[in-house]
Amino acid sequence: MALSDIIQRRDWENPQSVNIHCLKAHSPLASYRDINHARDGIHAQRQSLNGQWKFKLFDAPEQVEGEFIDVQFNDSAWGDITVPSNWQLQGYDKPIYANVKYPFEVNPPYVPADNPTGCYRTRLTLTEADLESTQRIIFDGVNSAFHLWCNGDWVGYSQDSRLPAEFDLSQYLTAGENTLAVMVIRWSDGSYLEDQDMWWLSGIFRDVTLLSKPKQCIEDVFITPDLDACYRDGSLSIVTHISAPETSQVHVQLFDGSQAVTEPSIARPHNRRIDERGSYDDVVFQTLHVREPQQWTAETPNLYRVVVSLLDAEGNHLESEAYQVGFRKVEVKDGQLQLNGKPLLIRGVNRHEHHPELGHVMTEEDMVRDICLMKQYNFNAVRTAHYPNHPRWYELCDQYGLYVCDEANIETHGMIPMNRLSADPQWAHAYMSRYTQMVMRDKNHPSIIIWSLGNESGHGSSHNAMYAWSKQFDPSRPVQYEGGGANTTATDIICPMYARVNTTVEDEAVPKWPIKQWISLPNEQRPLILCEYAHAMGNSLGNFNEYWDAFREFPRLQGGFIWDWVDQGLSQWDNDGKHFWAYGGDFGDTINDRQFCINGLIFPDRTPHPTLEEVKFCQRMITVALTQQDKQQCHLTVTNEYVFRSTDNEQLHWSVLENGVEVQSGQCTLAIDAGSQQTVDIALDFQPKADAKYHLNTDICLISATPWAQAGHVSATEQFTLSNTSSLTLPKISILSAPQLSEQGRDILVSNLDKKHQWQWNVESGLLTSWMVDGQSQLLHAPEDNFFRAPLDNDIGVSEIDNIDPNAWVCRWDAAGIGRWERECVSCTSESLSQAVKVTSTFAYHHNGGVQAITVWTYTLDNQGEMHIDVDVTLADHLPPMPRIGLELALPLPSDNTTVTWQGLGPFENYPDRLAAARFGQHTQSLDAMHTPYIFPTDSGLRSGTQWLNVGNLECTGDFLFSVSRFSQQQLTEAKHTNELTLEDKIYLRIDHQHMGVGGDDSWSPSVHEEFQLTDNTYRFSIMLKPRHN
């Protein structure tokens, strides 16, 4: 078929044209020519066609050179491109990021005339011996649609960018050199079904493979594991589809490594009568029974290998296929999702396939790294948001142990209403094809415990059809789907998005009750697992611990999948060579959703966000409780929340801290069965000091390395405050003379007797303009009131320049002028006391002709160089909740000491509604490490519960929260990327009395819980500052 005929057909604008001449979907095939090879997974008859292909991008399909499909076509002037890759990241076209919006006019099934089209050419050489077998080409992923030619002949067409397209090339190939030509179209009718929250990228982005199979071969294998009613003995139901005479035989055997577990089972077609018309002549049904197999779970990923062989009528071996299998049984029973008869608690995360340099291309190394990180941070489940992943991903989840919710490549979020296509019979074939082909490909993986019909496509007749087919074809797994309200008849699991723990999310169309209420609705017996929750956009995840308190309290609340795993930033460099992570709009894509793709728990390079520590803590598998304490010992109860394994590889390490410094430590081995407890007694062997604070830390550590973590890895932590029964000591009272007080013009001068410490206030500004110690300045900027924070993503919400949300925190703060108030010094007075000098400054803050706040600063200075600051704050009644109440000053940047040491909560960033994982102690970090480089710059680096702080040349004492940074709040507010920030030669020290929470139930509504909002009208706080090495 000529290219002009293909153009005229316009398959890419026809929802009925899904796959033309593609082979039926099936489980992955390898075609081993020996049973032992199949058992060992070696010498598969698969040849990778990855590598350098010739490439040229055209503006539209109509502009493609018609001769490019010909063998003789001269492609020497074309460029080279790596396969697999996304062409936008190879120097062609531009990436587009959109969350909801389609990046083209919505008129299904039609797509823009401006439709970039990438043409690929490559060559492969085959021998006469090769041609004796059938040769199949497999494209594991092409976005979004493509036509294929071989030696100038049209082979076929496919769309669905996340599933394989497989063609039989046998009739087109010749001995010697062969030419393949592929025309990939960026926009197709399939794009309407792929409106996921990710980058729109194009090209051949997954592997291309040539599979050689004998003419008589195995076409598909479906293996269904099961356990008996006692969950003890196992069975494997094996259904094999063959392309061979009905006299052929299928030989099946199960192996554990090289050891055969079962005797061979041999059967022929027609061995099961299907209905009154008879049986299949190309399908063989077999069952293997195994006594007490080692069961597969994410905690104990025990795998066996099934080898399925095709024999001719005389018993001669023709071909083998092999699959890793796990004995496990998934059920929704007694209102819970159960595995092997026990309820699960899903510690899950949504994961996009994203690489900062390669886009949607994932290497095995990338996949293993993600899985190891997930396991290290106590995840046990992953949702393939929102499409089937690379085939290798599932094999690795089988091997390392992760539960998988496998999701169909269907999302129509940008349609109005969302279910417009879901309810349209013209699109039913496309829906069914995407779902059934996913199930057919992935059906043998034990890690997949839930099928998902897709994401955010409303609820329509196509969902009911997919659900019905799934329950008939694979009743061994539950189905979930959130669209249409999370509890429709097309889901076995209530799976809402962003439902809160205790409050209702108002929505006229679909219910979003609090999760506690949802499971108590009349006649509702399904489990609830949040398909998305805890929106981790930037500095977020406030109140995450509340979800986990609820999950542990209510058995039918069985966890959820956090949104989401990785920031989808793309590596870019500015004109000065500074690296930054790009997001929507950075490539000239005018239809975009800006940084809404930056909502992961880890940075694009897989560096964890601080929020991941909170997740790790809340999701810990082993918990410790302090049940009793007396003078001699502490009594601990250690609970093993693993469902299927004992603590045979864990030790408990403990330490006692005195004012944050370790004074005693020890360890003990844990021997706790799954779901059980152990009591641990710790003898206290130290003499408590009066007025000291004592804490007990516990760490759960791995004894031996696992495939996903090194020996010594800390999987769980706790901290307990110990009571101190020692008598209080009387404070030492020193009789000191007061510093010298004088006035010079409009300045107030204070100095101690030896002139070592000198302070100066300007009466007109009311500010401390100078603080000298031994002739060296302590300050670069005077301490000032600080009510503002550089807005977080959660503060901004959906507000944009052209789409203002008046309810967003940033808009409410802006309307109140917070951050722009004009300061007026009402008065600045001083007086000399018997042992100190007191300076009092009163400030009024004006905006729009009214006073918004009044603050009174009282400085008390003694002869030892200590400066005590008491601040009284009064706010106007009409103000919104404030971002923070505190002060800010700037210190000189020391040349020899850029570390920060504090006693308080840490060591990582923590905020008032996200500090469950933080521990009290003495912590030291570099100055640079105190700043979190969020891709979209915001306030960061806060540490709470602080008693004292050493930074630069200053020591601070009190009860406060703080952050230090070399970036001003103005820089952090104005910058849109990290490369726009310039390190300043000073240290900004922000000391807060109170700081608003970060929120995180979602990122588009004001989600900071009321108890973490600053709603009072008056505040009072104190801080003591003095020079270090005083």
Swiss-Prot record:
Pfam families: Bgal_small_N (PF02929), Glyco_hydro_2 (PF00703), Glyco_hydro_2_C (PF02836), Glyco_hydro_2_N (PF02837), LacZ_4 (PF16353)
Keywords, in A-Z order: Glycosidase, Hydrolase, Magnesium, Metal-binding, Sodium
Disulfide bonds: none
Presence of the UniProt keyword Nucleotidyltransferase in the record: no
Presence of the UniProt keyword Hydrolase in the record: yes
Gene Ontology terms describing biological process: lactose catabolic process
Binding site for Mg(2+) 2: 592
Binding positions (substrate): 99, 197, 456, 532-535, 599, 1004
Residues reported to bind Na(+): 197, 596, 599
Active site residues of this protein: 456, 532
HAMAP family named among the record's database cross-references: Beta_gal (MF_01687)
Subunit structure: Homotetramer.
Cited NCBIfam families: PRK09525.1
Protein name: Beta-galactosidase
Organism: Photobacterium profundum (strain SS9)
Lineage of producing organism: Bacteria, Pseudomonadati, Pseudomonadota, Gammaproteobacteria, Vibrionales
